[in-house]
């Protein structure tokens, strides 16, 4: 016959600090692209808002764009660069 010694189960939760959850109010961020704006390589006033001072494409998190909008914006910026509407790099002078 097998003998097992049952140990009393300890509660380790008493050593842990209680978790405090700070609920932040949910803010709805407005999209920087309005409903009338078309993401197009010819729309330079729109494209220039999503490029850094060095000429880099800003990330979607910085831009507050959806992934689909960011993808369309990236393609429009690249197309504008190829057609020489935008420089690939900005001079630092």
Swiss-Prot record:
List this protein's GO terms for biological process.
translation
Localization per record: Plastid, Chloroplast
Q: Per the record's keyword annotation, is Iron included, yes or no?
A: no
Keywords, in A-Z order: Chloroplast, Plastid, Ribonucleoprotein, Ribosomal protein, RNA-binding, rRNA-binding
Tell me, in one coarse class, where this protein mainly resides.
plastid
Q: Out of the domains of life, which is the source?
A: Eukaryota
Gene Ontology molecular function terms on file: small ribosomal subunit rRNA binding; structural constituent of ribosome
In terms of Pfam families, this protein maps to:
Ribosomal_S18 (PF01084)
InterPro entries in alphabetical order: Ribosomal_bS18, Ribosomal_bS18_CS, Ribosomal_bS18_sf
Stored SUPFAM superfamilies: Ribosomal protein S18
Give the PROSITE patterns listed for this entry: RIBOSOMAL_S18
- Please provide one cellular component term from the Gene Ontology annotations of this protein: mitochondrial small ribosomal subunit
Q: Is Membrane tagged as a keyword? A: no
* NCBIfam families in the cross-refs: S18 (TIGR00165)
Query: Could you describe the subunit structure of this protein?
Result: Part of the 30S ribosomal subunit.
Which family, according to UniProt? Belongs to the bacterial ribosomal protein bS18 family.
- Descriptive protein name: Small ribosomal subunit protein bS18c
Species whose genome carries this gene: Pinus koraiensis (Korean pine)
Lineage, broadest ranks: Eukaryota, Viridiplantae, Streptophyta, Embryophyta, Tracheophyta
């Amino acid at each position: 016959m097998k003998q097992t010694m049952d140990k009393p189960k300890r509660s380790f939760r008493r050593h842990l600090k209680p978790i405090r959850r700070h609920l932040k109010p949910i803010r709805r961020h407005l999209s920087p692209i309005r409903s009338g704006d078309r993401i197009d390589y010819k729309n330079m006033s729109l494209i220039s808002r999503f490029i850094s001072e060095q000429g880099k494409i800003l990330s979607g998190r910085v831009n507050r764009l959806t992934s689909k909008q960011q993808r369309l914006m990236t393609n429009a910026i690249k197309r504008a660069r190829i057609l020489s509407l935008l420089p690939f790099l900005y001079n630092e002078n």
